Structures are given as C-alpha cells and as structure tokens.
C-alpha cells in the first residue's frame, strides 16, 4: 500500500534538502533513537520510521518517485504477485532488459543468483583501486639519457585517525538492527513460478552488518581521506613521445581488501631548438661561412652531450649531410646502441663586404673566368656561383 508518511517531516528536513543535509539529519536521529542507545519503548518504532524515510530520500530515483506520487511503489512494473499473477503495469518493452536484472526483480539474490554470478557477492569481492593518469613534459636530453622525476599525487588513503574503521576513536560500529548484523534482508515472494525467498543487500548498512553511530571527525565515516604524496620514478634512456610508465600500486586504494590501482605516466617531449628527432637519429642544420666551405676547416657543433669540433672538407656544398656516428638517441631496448647525429650543411654568404674583400673576390672571379656584370650586385652573383647558376 502507498505510504501516507511525510518522510521529510520524519527526518526534519525541507523538501529541497541536499543529500548531505539528509545524511546529517539521519545520523543525528540515529544517534538519538537507536534501540541500543535509547531504551524508550517507542524508540524502536521511531527508529524504523527514520530508516524507512532515509532509504527513500537517500536514493535519487526513489526520492523523485516519492516527490511526484507521494509514495514509492513496490515491485513497480510487474504488478502485485500476492495471490497470483497480476499483470498490472507490465510493460512488454521491458522484455528487452538484461535477464539478470529481470530475474533479480523477481527473485532478488535467490537460487537464480548463482546463475547470474551472484551480484551481491561480486559487490563484496575484492576490487582493485582506480588508476590515475599524469602527463609530464621532458627535454630531448632527458629522453635520450633518462632522468629521475617526482610528481605530487592527491589520492585516497586509509584514514590515520580511525585506521579505516570510519568511527570516532574510542567508539565502535553497532550491529545493524534492520538485518540483525547479517548484511542481508530475506523476504518471501509469491511469483508466477511459485514462492521464493528473496535475499537482498540490507539498504541500511549496505551489506556490512554494522552501522556507524559516531563517525570519525576526520574522514566523516568513510575510513578514507585525501592526501598529497610525493612519488618518485625513473624515466629510462631512449623514450619517445607518448611513452607510458606504469607505477604499480601507486593509484587509489582498493576496496574489500583489493589491491591499489596504478599510476600511468604519459611522456611528452618538448620540441628542441636545434635538433629534430627521427627515431634514434637526430637532425640539425649547420650554418658555415662560405670561406670554410671553399677552403675547409674546423667548426664547432652542438651535440646532446655538449659541443664538439668537426672538420669541414674543402668544396663542401649546401645540403651535404655530415654524419656523427653514435651521437644520436640510445635504443630503448639496447642501451649500448645509439643512433646517429645528422648535420645538414647550410653555407652562408656575407651581406656586406669591405672594399678590400670586394677587390680580392673580383680577382678570384677573373681567375675562374667568372664575368661579373657591373649592373648586378656582386654578392648576388657570388650566391649564384655557389648555387651552380650561370
């Protein structure tokens, strides 16, 4: 039968109360009327009303139904099976629902529970904690040679005050009076297939068999608190963009004795000002003076490990590639093997010449049979000569 009780009035909260306000009111009334704490004969009935109101108002779906219709239907959608098959509001569209949900609506965690995996037991089974993801930017040098890093992780941990019990120090949970500490509610159900025992998780203690009367002031009864921790880890030599490092057991704590989750570090490499990476090789452009290109000589080039001198052979052309063996990125799977550094030569021609330099270059041009057109800039012609244009 639909209830005529005003659940909001029972809990002493307004109709627009938040879930936190409803929970606080419930806990206050539980401490006041719990039969183990209040010996008044009327306390037991009042306590049942409080639990009934909280069961509805703490569930958003049930609360919405209560607010709309003034009651919460029992076994909605299948009619009332007391006394035989009553189709009532049966919606044939519901036939497409998952069979597990249909049978649990009929039988709860009854004999059919084993056929569908025993949902209640699955809920109590150890579960791994949630994994966490962090993204970190590193330099090309750190990617090449590896590095040690640290991050600060905010995660749930066991409450240090109550040691995970959820109760205020010096107090203990009390046995749930709704399920008598079993964590289960057993009801007889008359169905089209006969009479069955319906076993469901206790809505009051959520299957724990215990009720926290005095919640811990630090974790508010959850047994867990958020803490910021420093986590150190190593980046191996040779990693590339998108590489993922797994830190086992550093994620959120597990439930029901399950293992902690993991942290996954996603590596991103900051673009380098000089080098471009190509797998294990690195590439760079090296501007050199045109005289070095003509006559040859030593120049200083940057490498991942510092500056190094190399020799430019006479007559080197723009676009030539000089290879420094073993100066690239170490192979991730073989630290003793490295890629190469590829240097692309880019010859630079001066924009301004002194009169003496111009005179000498004109002499060289004559020796090489180059006709310097007087109406064209000598520097443009020199550039053309280096490019091979005539």
Swiss-Prot record:
A zinc finger (CR-type) spans 146-228. Its main location: cytoplasm. The keyword Manganese does not apply. Keywords: Chaperone, Cytoplasm, DNA replication, Metal-binding, Repeat, Stress response, Zinc, Zinc-finger. One of its GO terms (biological process) is protein refolding. Pfam families: DnaJ (PF00226), DnaJ_C (PF01556), DnaJ_CXXCXGXG (PF00684). GO terms for cellular component: cytoplasm. SUPFAM superfamilies: Chaperone J-domain, DnaJ/Hsp40 cysteine-rich domain, HSP40/DnaJ peptide-binding domain. Residues 6-70 form the J domain. GO terms for molecular function: ATP binding; heat shock protein binding; unfolded protein binding; zinc ion binding. Gene3D superfamilies: DnaJ domain, Heat shock protein DnaJ, cysteine-rich domain, Urease metallochaperone UreE, N-terminal domain. Zn(2+) 2 binds at residues 176, 179, 202, 205. HAMAP family: DnaJ. PANTHER family: CHAPERONE PROTEIN DNAJ, DNAJ HOMOLOG 1, MITOCHONDRIAL-RELATED. The J domain is necessary and sufficient to stimulate DnaK ATPase activity. Zinc center 1 plays an important role in the autonomous, DnaK-independent chaperone activity of DnaJ. Zinc center 2 is essential for interaction with DnaK and for DnaJ activity. Homodimer. Participates actively in the response to hyperosmotic and heat shock by preventing the aggregation of stress-denatured proteins and by disaggregating proteins, also in an autonomous, DnaK-independent fashion. Unfolded proteins bind initially to DnaJ; upon interaction with the DnaJ-bound protein, DnaK hydrolyzes its bound ATP, resulting in the formation of a stable complex. GrpE releases ADP from DnaK; ATP binding to DnaK triggers the release of the substrate protein, thus completing the reaction cycle. This is Chaperone protein DnaJ. It comes from Dictyoglomus thermophilum (strain ATCC 35947 / DSM 3960 / H-6-12).
